[in-house]
A protein has these predicted regions:
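Paired acidic/hydrophobic, glycine-rich loop segments that form the ligand-binding mouth/hinge
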Residues: 87-92, 200-204, 220-222, 312
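N-terminal export signals
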Residues: 7-23
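C-terminal lobe and pocket-closing loops
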Residues: 123, 209-277, 306-309, 323
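Hinge/capping helix and adjacent helix->loop/strand transition within the periplasmic-binding protein
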Residues: 82-87, 102-189, 238, 251-284
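An extracytoplasmic/periplasmic, membrane-proximal ligand-sensing/linker region
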Residues: 29-31, 173-177, 214, 239-240, ...
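Short loop/turn segments at beta->alpha junctions
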Residues: 5, 72, 138, 183-187, ...
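Beta->alpha turn/N-cap motifs
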Residues: 91-96, 157, 187, 204-209, ...
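N-terminal (or domain-start) structured segment
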Residues: 23-113, 152, 160, 177-200, ...
């Protein structure tokens, strides 16, 4: 066997560089999977499918959307975190993607350490909606009605510790009223019960309730964003309605499992941004109630950190734990 000289050993790293670069350049070598932690037709699913086609063209491989609903998004989000094939990304929301471990210390993953932010795809303002029988046409009137009827107003959420729950609890604490929390497993069922009058109020993500607002089945009192929402421009903000409330905005993020190479994340983030910049995709999502973003990884990382600080504090203060 020939012995390598000192000079030959020194040259080895340089000789290996082209091979390493070539291996990185060939990624992806097979189809890419996007796990969506919610069912088909949900807002996270719509966001994933909005980038799916462009990503497939840009990456030169099929991109498959794999819906993994259940557990309020935690089951699918854990599947994203646990993927080890190097070809898996995932779409989830705040809660499963940020404060999940604070709400449930027994959760099988930690969003902060087991997920790598790729792109903040979109934001969705919340809308305070009520059944038409509620004698309130502004958020301030709703607060006054709730104060005059302590414990007699029921409101929906999509589960303990979700934004729809925390937004109402935060407003109730600030304004000094009590209401009965009725958690649901799905937005659709909560909206059906609101339309039927079985509950009186709901902080709903805009994309899940726009048709009912437009058809007059529910009354929109205020949006929770800092500015009016273009999809329903006649609905004022909470502050315009006379209620002291910080903005509450849902978000949809694209993540990768921890350990995914930074170059891969940067590439997918850039292509996701290009996909969402396409006019046709943008218009379709805006019509569905989205505020389209398509950010760099740093923006999503900051959003997760903000959620942990703000909403994590409320979860701890209220002593919230998941159902069951």
């Amino acid at each position: 066997m020939a012995l390598l000289t000192r000079r030959g050993l020194a040259a080895l790293p340089a000789l290996m560089l082209p091979a390493a670069a070539g291996a990185q350049a060939t990624w992806p070598e097979r189809p890419v999977r996007i796990i969506v932690a919610f069912p088909g037709g949900s807002t996270p699913d719509l966001a994933a499918r909005a980038v799916q086609g462009h990503l497939a063209q840009a990456l030169g491989q099929p991109v498959v959307v794999d819906n993994r609903p259940g557990g309020g998004g935690h089951l699918g989000t854990e599947a994203i975190a646990r993927a080890t094939d190097g070809h898996t990304f995932g779409v989830t929301i705040g809660g499963p993607g940020s404060t999940g471990k604070i709400l449930n210390p027994a959760l099988g993953y930690d969003p902060v350490t087991d997920l790598m932010p790729v792109s903040l795809l979109a934001r969705l303002p919340f809308v305070l909606v009520v059944h038409p029988s509620v004698p309130a046409r502004t958020a301030a009137e709703f607060v006054a009605h709730a104060k005059a009827n302590p414990g007699r107003i029921s409101y929906a959420s999509t589960g303990p510790g979700t934004l729809s729950h925390l937004a109402m609890e935060d407003m109730a604490a600030r304004e000094g009223f009590e209401a009965v929390h009725v958690p649901y497993r799905a937005v659709g069922q909560a909206v059906l019960d609101l339309v039927a009058g079985r509950i009186q109020a709901f902080f709903a993500a805009s994309g899940g309730v726009l048709p009912q607002i437009r058809e007059g089945q529910v009354r929109a009192l205020a949006v929770t964003s800092s500015e009016r929402f273009p999809a329903i421009p006649d609905v004022p903000t909470m502050r315009e309605s006379g209620v002291n409330a910080d903005p509450v905005v849902a978000w949809i993020g694209l993540f990768a499992p921890a350990g995914t190479p930074a170059e891969r994340i940067a590439r997918v983030a850039a292509e996701a941004g290009r996909a969402l910049a396409e006019p046709e995709q943008r218009r379709a999502l805006e019509t569905a109630g989205f505020v389209v973003v398509g950010s760099a990884p740093e923006v999503l990382r900051a959003q997760v950190a903000s959620d942990v600080e703000r909403w994590g504090g409320i979860i701890r203060r209220l002593g919230l734990r998941p159902e069951g």
